[in-house]
A protein has these predicted regions:
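Conserved, structured core segments of small domains
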Residues: 1-101
Length: 101
């Protein structure tokens, strides 16, 4: 099952530093997800100045419980980078200029 995550970073004065400090662990954690095909697409949400203020994630898990289990281990969650996360079921239609089944 595919999911769309829209995750907003905190807006406190330490938010940017928290993201920077945790970013390496975040990428180490998502690398196996990419290799297993669970992470279909992802990237940072930017403000008008080009600063990272959140993330968009298109992920594929067998069910919502498995997605929730991943979030309990995701460094951006455990270290307080993402403060507000919207999660919606999603069906990917186009990826890299190709229509997906």
């Amino acid at each position: 099952m595919q999911f769309l995550l829209l995750a907003h970073d905190g807006t406190d004065k330490d938010a940017k530093a928290r993201r920077t400090a945790v970013r390496r662990a975040h990428f180490a954690g998502i690398k196996p997800m990419v290799e297993r095909g669970e992470l279909r697409a992802a990237g940072a949400i930017l403000d008008e100045a080009g600063e990272m203020i959140g993330s968009v994630v298109l992920a594929e898990f067998p069910n919502r419980a498995d997605l929730d289990a991943w979030l309990t281990r995701e460094p951006y969650v455990t270290e307080g980078v993402w403060k507000n996360i919207e999660i919606k079921p999603f069906r990917l239609a186009v990826l890299d200029g190709k229509i997906t089944p």
